[in-house]
Amino acid sequence: MTENNPTRCGYVAIVGRPNVGKSTLLNHILGQKLAITSRKPQTTRHNMLGIKTEGDVQAIYVDTPGMHKANDKALNRYMNRNASAALKDVDVVIFVVDRTRWTDEDQLVLERVQYVTGPLIIAVNKTDRMDEKAELIPHLQWLQEQLPNAEVVPISAQQGHNLEALEALIAKHLPENDHFFPEDQITDRSSRFLAAELVREKIMRQLGAELPYQITVEIEEFKQQGHVLHIHALILVERDGQKKIIIGDKGERIKRIGSDARKDMETLFDAKVMLNLWVKVKGGWSDDERALRSLGYGDL
């Protein structure tokens, strides 16, 4: 604590519909890639903490899965429960919306956050894409009318526009507390978890329109030998056809997935990485609560 500034620390939930820019926002605030991103909805499946300590202020961000209407599989129910649970026991809630469109799933999130009793901030994303800034004003006014107790901040998560103002507003609302984490800690997640997420991100980016959503990644080995990290990752799918898609013609696609994931791992872990990937069919895992628990999806 400095003479004029109290030490502040608290939890900040980042919520919104799928693919609205929540993970991109977290990565930009942290100044490094922690949460995986892609253009595909439901890229984020787990709540994850991203911790930023700056001077007397420690903000502990909770990146959440996008709230969505699909509830037909156990995996969908898990993600929706995770996102809703993040609204409880946090000090600040950031509701991320996309300036360019409003969907039924945005409305679903709005109906959840209207019951938030603590500080609520609406982060209006992608405002850098507007040719006429005057067009933004009616949209901001409409949001303010929907959530009159919220503060509205236009941002660009991708470009970093106005994030300093957003962070200053968050810091103002954090309670006076000693810091909960060491200054150099940036997440609560293990290296094994982060490695699995990087592989899954590369799969989602490589597959495009062919993407089978019933994919998960399990790290079977994570071992340091000298200056080299040896990582063995198992990619689980539900059907033989999905396995063929991931492997690709003569194994070319899985080679690209492995190469791209390895490069990001070497940056994240600051070490040389030897990465081996396997693909295995496990039918129905995404709707099997026991299988989901064994794969690290927690309480269902």
From Swiss-Prot:
MF-aspect GO terms: GTP binding; GTPase activity; ribosomal small subunit binding; small ribosomal subunit rRNA binding
InterPro entries: G_ERA_dom (IPR030388), GTP-bd (IPR006073), GTPase_Era-like (IPR005662), KH_dom-like_a/b (IPR015946), KH_dom_type_2 (IPR004044), KH_sf_prok-type (IPR009019), P-loop_NTPase (IPR027417), Small_GTP-bd (IPR005225)
Residues annotated to bind GTP: 16-23, 63-67, 125-128
Pfam families linked: KH_2, MMR_HSR1
Residue ranges of the region described as G5: 155-157
Main location: cytoplasm
GO biological process, one term: ribosomal small subunit assembly
CDD domains: Era, KH-II_Era
Membrane topology: Peripheral membrane protein
A GO CC term attached to the entry: cytosol
SUPFAM superfamilies: P-loop containing nucleoside triphosphate hydrolases, Prokaryotic type KH domain (KH-domain type II)
Family: Belongs to the TRAFAC class TrmE-Era-EngA-EngB-Septin-like GTPase superfamily. Era GTPase family.
Description of how the protein assembles with itself and partners: Monomer.
Protein name: GTPase Era
The species this protein was found in: Pseudomonas putida (strain W619)
